[in-house]
Amino acid sequence: MSAQKPGLHPRNRHHSRYDLATLCQVNPELRQFLTLTPAGEQSVDFANPLAVKALNKALLAHFYAVANWDIPDGFLCPPVPGRADYIHHLADLLAEASGTIPANASILDIGVGANCIYPLIGVHEYGWRFTGSETSSQALSSAQAIISANPGLNRAIRLRRQKESGAIFNGIIHKNEQYDATLCNPPFHNSATAARAGSERKRRNLGLNKDDALNFGGQQQELWCEGGEVAFIKKMIEESKGFAKQVMWFTSLVSRGENLPPLYRALTDVGAVKVVKKEMAQGQKQSRFIAWTFMNDEQRRRFVNRQR
């Protein structure tokens, strides 16, 4: 039986329910984590981080030709369909300048993470080239291990360590470099206490005890920063002005709709020429990203058609 997942992008490969028999063939580790729902249907034990990791391994191998993928304990294990949605909507945004999705786009992923998920999907789906930035040396090592373990990715994905505390684009975008877009899944919480409380809520909702590990665990830099998501994105907006001619579209996920008004005000303050909001939905989960540019329509057309 196949059921549509409401709201996923038309090009997303995950509209139907997971074909667990096929995914277990791709990654036999997954079989031990299968469960039955109250309706008697086979599912995955999503409360178990090892199950989610095994599912991700299978999905990335089966749909995105990533045969070797792993992350260290304690790092975020992202849901693949939602991450793919961001990539596909970003592709539509890039296509607006010329009418077609650019095949050789250069993308900057702010906070690439130990999982390297956005570059892996973007390289496979569109042949894009990625630069991934990261503050954590452990996350960077994990992402590099994934790249090195899969033929062809070394030519498509490069990584850079953000050494400047509090900086986002500064120190990462080099002089004379150009990017079609940046993307980011920013830290959500405004303190370690808030991050712990959020994890505790999810624990209770899943009926887990305190010692159970969770697939939405994560390192400090993945979960929180001073001032939370709004402060992080506002800092990104402030810095983006300095790279107005080097980047066509700056984008970031925004977890809550109520966080948008202060971000729109910040974008007005820096003189953004155009601001776009893309709504997304994965099942019951609503999400969105905002995009802004300092280039007008004609400048964006010229940028897309530039010599690379």
UniProtKB/Swiss-Prot annotation:
Q: What GO annotations for molecular function exist for this entry?
A: 23S rRNA (adenine(1618)-N(6))-methyltransferase activity
Report the EC code(s) recorded for this entry.
Answer: 2.1.1.181
Give the location in the cell.
Cytoplasm
* UniProt keyword list: Cytoplasm, Methyltransferase, rRNA processing, S-adenosyl-L-methionine, Transferase
Its primary localisation, in coarse terms, equals: cytoplasm
**S-adenosyl-L-methionine listed as a keyword:** yes
User: Which reaction does this chain catalyze?
Assistant: adenosine(1618) in 23S rRNA + S-adenosyl-L-methionine = N(6)-methyladenosine(1618) in 23S rRNA + S-adenosyl-L-homocysteine + H(+)
One family from Pfam that matches here is Methyltransf_10
Task: Report any one BP term from Gene Ontology.
Answer: rRNA base methylation
This protein's name: Ribosomal RNA large subunit methyltransferase F
Question: What is the organism lineage in this UniProt record?
Answer: Bacteria, Pseudomonadati, Pseudomonadota, Gammaproteobacteria, Enterobacterales
